[in-house]
């Protein structure tokens, strides 16, 4: 009787015992009167020795990635044949029976990490690519993480509830994927960009703790960290403040990182306001794995004769600097030109620099800083071989963002980023609105259901631009991992927000009437967050693309080479739906 086991179950106790394993053939080695088959299942690899004449005839027909059943005797390898790189490298199975379960066609690419297959080819044969250990292990880790999330939240009395995937189209910034209704011709459902409104309705229904591993959909251009369909941990709680949500997420992530990749996170994550993050790092999702920080030098240059700085300060703009210690010799003219191109992209008044040599400014704009030279050297503790970069703009945010991108570029070029670090950061107190100078209109900075901070509510309409919301983001290594807020639970306040962003009563009733009605029936104060599962696993596994951690992702054109979707449908289907296809060129 053969004991059915998996490859990882081979051990000393099974020596000289009969075992049976079902697996795929990873490698074949012919050695005259015997053949070695390296086999693989989901759990591990193992080696099979074939030396009986009748079995050799079968083994000679076997090719790579055949699915086979092996029955045999587990034996120890000779000392000179032990493979220390395999967990099962001390054993091999002496084959007694071989059954070919299924053959495999000629492979489109080798099932190895260093194959040169194109992305489209790998996606077309995703079921083969998933046999690679590195890819397989990422998917398994994802499964472990979501299992931990569920257990963690259920233990804390959260309810896992499912919200609809056919919803009313209420665009949240990106385009909706729409679904035509056959029954209601001319009408459309949308696939949800998030369960936002439904999770708020769940709070109004009295379920005070909700979560969902939610599938979400956005019709936007694909890029490295985005897909048209994605997964997020969506959760909401009644009667909470943001600090309650911070603590919950910190404890959950501590558990996930410890159990999945054996990393001990701090029990509490660092926190910073949006304004401080912009001033210090030039980003609302700063990478804090390195210390390179922005500083505002406007006060020190208030009497500057350099026209760019003089005009900026006259217009109440901002001058930002970045000091790189003891690295001036690393910045050639060509490298500085590359940094200047980044500044141009952000339409700043340019990027300027000077170096410190012989305790004086040298090169760049040194000649324009003679008056302030010694004061700046003393104030900023400048030393020989330091270099200072300056950028100026009439708009504070533009100056910050430009220098923030330059900060990242410098850190990458100088190797300042510790790739083994996991640096979490809460960014909070975001502006509630964004203002478009061209259209002279306001739009939500995050979404239109976030609560303004208490001190801004009374005079909300007088100065929307300065209104701060109860909004927070969770950042990991410079990537926005999650976003949340305390929500509006008052109909009147929600209507005021709608009006500021240009939704007059008729429009707000048409799009959100069902939700406004619900706010009239005893809505609790509530708040929540959504954490991107795909991004989380991508960062935990140090993957370069989000596609690596999704089982069946789309390519960069939001298409699937595996099943050739999206595809055209028949004229009969179109007729049933009441749809006519119009040539886009007409």
Curated annotation (Swiss-Prot):
Binding residue positions for ATP: 218-220, 227, 480, 532-535
Oligomer and partners: Homodimer.
Reaction catalyzed: tRNA(Asx) + L-aspartate + ATP = L-aspartyl-tRNA(Asx) + AMP + diphosphate
Top-level taxon of origin: Bacteria
EC number: 6.1.1.23
Family the entry assigns: Belongs to the class-II aminoacyl-tRNA synthetase family. Type 1 subfamily.
Aspartate: annotated span: 196-199
The protein's enzyme class: ligase
Pfam hit, one: tRNA_anti-codon
Name under which the protein is recorded: Aspartate--tRNA(Asp/Asn) ligase
Main function: Aspartyl-tRNA synthetase with relaxed tRNA specificity since it is able to aspartylate not only its cognate tRNA(Asp) but also tRNA(Asn). Reaction proceeds in two steps: L-aspartate is first activated by ATP to form Asp-AMP and then transferred to the acceptor end of tRNA(Asp/Asn).
Keyword line: Aminoacyl-tRNA synthetase, ATP-binding, Cytoplasm, Ligase, Nucleotide-binding, Protein biosynthesis
One BP annotation, GO: aspartyl-tRNA aminoacylation
Residues holding L-aspartate: 172, 218, 446, 487
InterPro entries, per database record: Aa-tRNA-synt_II, aa-tRNA-synth_II, aa-tRNA-synth_II/BPL/LPL, Asp-tRNA-ligase_1, Asp-tRNA-ligase_1_N, Asp/Asn-tRNA-synth_IIb, AspRS_core, GAD-like_sf
SUPFAM superfamilies found in the cross-reference section: Class II aaRS and biotin synthetases, GAD domain-like, Nucleic acid-binding proteins
Gene3D superfamilies assigned to the protein according to its UniProt record, in alphabetical order: Bira Bifunctional Protein, Domain 2, GAD-like domain, Nucleic acid-binding proteins
PANTHER family: ASPARTATE--TRNA LIGASE, MITOCHONDRIAL (PTHR22594:SF5), ASPARTYL/LYSYL-TRNA SYNTHETASE (PTHR22594)
CDD domains per UniProt: AspRS_core, EcAspRS_like_N
GO molecular function list: aspartate-tRNA ligase activity; aspartate-tRNA(Asn) ligase activity; ATP binding; nucleic acid binding
Location of this chain's protein in the cell: Cytoplasm
Site (Important for tRNA non-discrimination) residue list: 31
A single Gene Ontology CC term: cytoplasm
